[in-house]
């Protein structure tokens, strides 16, 4: 294989490796439940899914509000 073809293959593999985790659709949701709705202006969108939040936080939906919140756990 020529060096140009090898570089192209390496570039495509790198791009594929970078784009694969972005989907996040196959990942299970994080444990815990979202706490009660906060008092905030309507339609604030801080996150898209649990994996766009830091650490153990979950992406919680309250109507059109999406925000990262610490989970609560119910026994």
Swiss-Prot record:
It comes from the Eukaryota. Disulfide bonds join 34-60, 43-64, 47-59, 53-68. GO terms for cellular component: extracellular region; extracellular space. GO terms for molecular function: serine-type endopeptidase inhibitor activity. Keywords: Antibiotic, Antimicrobial, Disulfide bond, Secreted, Signal. One of its GO terms (biological process) is venom-mediated disruption of cell wall in another organism. Residues 27-72 form the WAP domain. SMART domains: WAP. Residues 1-24 form the signal peptide. PROSITE patterns: WAP (PS51390). Its main location: secreted. The keyword Signal applies. InterPro entries: Elafin-like_sf, WAP_dom, WAP_four-disulfide_core. It holds the Pfam family WAP. It is found in: Secreted. Damages membranes of susceptible bacteria. Has no hemolytic activity. Not toxic to mice. Does not inhibit the proteinases elastase and cathepsin G. Belongs to the venom waprin family. This is Nigwaprin-a.
């Amino acid at each position: 294989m020529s060096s140009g073809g090898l570089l192209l293959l390496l570039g495509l593999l790198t791009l594929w490796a970078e784009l694969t985790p972005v989907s996040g659709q196959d990942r299970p949701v994080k444990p815990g439940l979202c706490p009660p709705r906060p008092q905030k202006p309507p339609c604030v969108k801080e996150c898209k899914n649990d994996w766009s939040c830091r650490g153990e936080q979950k992406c919680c939906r309250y109507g059109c509000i999406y925000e990262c919140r610490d989970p609560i756990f119910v026994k």
